[in-house]
Amino acid sequence: MSKFIKSFQYGKHEVRFETGEIARQADGAVMVAMGDTQLLVTVVGAKNAKAGQDFFPLTVQYQEKAYAAGRIPGGFLKREGRPSEKETLTSRLIDRPIRPLFPKGFMNEVQVIATVVSLDPEIGTEVPAMLGTSAALSISGIPFDGPIGAAVVGYKDNDYILNPSSQELQESDLELSVAGTSDAVLMVESEASELSEEIMLGAVMFGHEQMQVAIDAIKELKAEVGKPAWNWEAAEEDIDLKTKVFDAIRSDIEAAYDIADKMDRYAAIDAAKTKVMEALAATEENPEGYDAGDIEKMVGKLQKEIVRGRIIAGEPRIDGRDTQTIRSIDCQVGILPKVHGSALFTRGETQAIVVTTLGTEKDAKMVDDLTGSYNDRFMLHYNFPPYSVGECGRVGSPGRREIGHGMLARRGVAALLPTADEFPYTIRVVSEITESNGSSSMATVCGTSMSLMHAGVPLAAPIAGIAMGLVKEESGFAVLSDILGDEDHLGDMDFKVAGTEQGVTALQMDIKITGITQEIMHIALKQAKEGRLHILKEMEKAIGSSNQDVATTAPRFFTVKVKPEKVREIIGKGGATIRSITEETGVTIEIDDDGNVKIAAVDDESANAAKARIAEITAEPEIGKVYDAKVVKIVDFGAFVSYMPGREGLVHVSQIADERVEDVNEYLKEGQEIKVRLTDVDKQGRVKLSIKAV
């Protein structure tokens, strides 16, 4: 067993690859360390593709182990369960830059598993996870046109920061993840505080430049310990079949792409497919015909050639637009009467109903990850039901795509949200995609902005999002604004930008080809800004600023300040007192150790009742004041009475009546309601109560 180690300096951290000792039965296995953050990344590929396989079955699984941070998992089973949101998003982050680097036609199953085994809370796991995946694939022998590098870029005080620590990210105006090869950027994911397009592009180029040291190290690792490359070659294209398919239905497909309506267009394309299948596919009557799957692939190639060729030639796009025109937009707010905030955003054949719900601090989502537990007071949930694309399908818990799209939309609006001190609500936004033909995540950003403003959330500025596309051939390129679903599928780049009039708040880029230059990205960002500003103007027609007040059905907050030593009295034994207040008044109460009592109520009457109860509990005894009291216990020398919530005092036998009292039971009974006057408080805080002084 021989272990090989490759180390290099990456910014302020040392990165170390170890291979040859652990997980030796995997095709590729690398233990990657960045400081004290360490992951085991393994790659396994099936030597043969399954018969009839018509897609590339790549799966990436990023998983965090509690022991990596010296913790034991919670829950009854005390072991890791279903993937967390962070694990799902990181799996997607690894998948996106490596997927386009597998050769066309490669259909063998490949599985990547990245396991966090040691964690330094100040060093994130995303960069070592992507570098470890790149290294494991590079040495595995599996066909892979890598390696890739990865970096996280921060921005503070006009300077870019390479792979910032967790503390630095909290103070940064930017968190941008970028991955790419030695000569091309492949993936960007970012969240920003209204930064300019120039700063965003500069961050991408800075990250790509800095990651070259990692790419070079992985190339050296491959040269020294890489396994022999698999003997795999893509099947040769069937020119005869291609000619027959193209000749048979080219005119039909061209006519289909003159149809603006998506469903009508798909029907025309399906008719053309049926026509060519009937003519060329193998059947019992025609066993010499072609495989139906091969014919389907050729139809796809014809579709791609026609759509891309028209765009490069400067002809109108599928729905008749030029490259910069945005589809027609319709915006409405207040479409649902009993919710706290709602909006309907429609852009062409993409539509979202977005609903905002306001809650209290107790409604915040408790997140428990390797770094610890915290409460998240802003949630954005994206749902993509099958009917939105006219299909039947699974309905249930969200998939990876829905989680990813929801997080992208969340990043787009998060920087504009008020602080907890400015707006003490927990906020949940749900985006229901009711129609989809491209850019539903950006429709969610637009709908979220309007829904939040309608709910009375004081956003710093309205936010809009737009999806850009790219078609690039040897003869030229075209950047497309507000892409359709087909343009996303048939194009070379998916480029989503969210932001305000002032700047960018989120940027996501996935590039399927090499050769995307800085000039092309600059044009795309500039064109995206123009489109974003147009969309913001359309949104402003429905709602231009946040409503001044929240909905009447939303909770309202009232704050009462009490002395810290009174907190225990409000809570009561085992929480009995505070529970009785909430049950009797219908409010929600949150209280901290500093004496800040936050009351959430749906109306003033409930709030006032709760405040009155709290005032009673925390009130200080006043000498000379008459109180309504109840006899709690009778003793030989008097009676103990409850005269204030949580407070008891003694009425001495001499203070029960004007005459001499021989037997207290002749004058008082336990449970009897009486009036008493507080006559004095001694130095120990003990009160003197009198019945006869009333």
Curated annotation (Swiss-Prot):
Coiled coil residues, start to end: none
Entry GO MF terms: 3'-5'-RNA exonuclease activity; magnesium ion binding; polyribonucleotide nucleotidyltransferase activity; RNA binding
Primary location: cytoplasm
Catalytic class of the enzyme: transferase
Pfam families in the record: KH_1 (PF00013), PNPase (PF03726), RNase_PH (PF01138), RNase_PH_C (PF03725), S1 (PF00575)
EC annotation from Swiss-Prot or TrEMBL: 2.7.7.8
Catalyzed reactions per annotation: RNA(n+1) + phosphate = RNA(n) + a ribonucleoside 5'-diphosphate
Keyword Transferase tagged: yes
Cofactor(s) named in the record: Mg(2+)
One GO term (biological process): RNA processing
Residue ranges of domain S1 motif in the record: 624-692
Domain annotation KH: ranges: 555-614
Function: Involved in mRNA degradation. Catalyzes the phosphorolysis of single-stranded polyribonucleotides processively in the 3'- to 5'-direction.
Protein family: Belongs to the polyribonucleotide nucleotidyltransferase family.
Protein name as annotated: Polyribonucleotide nucleotidyltransferase
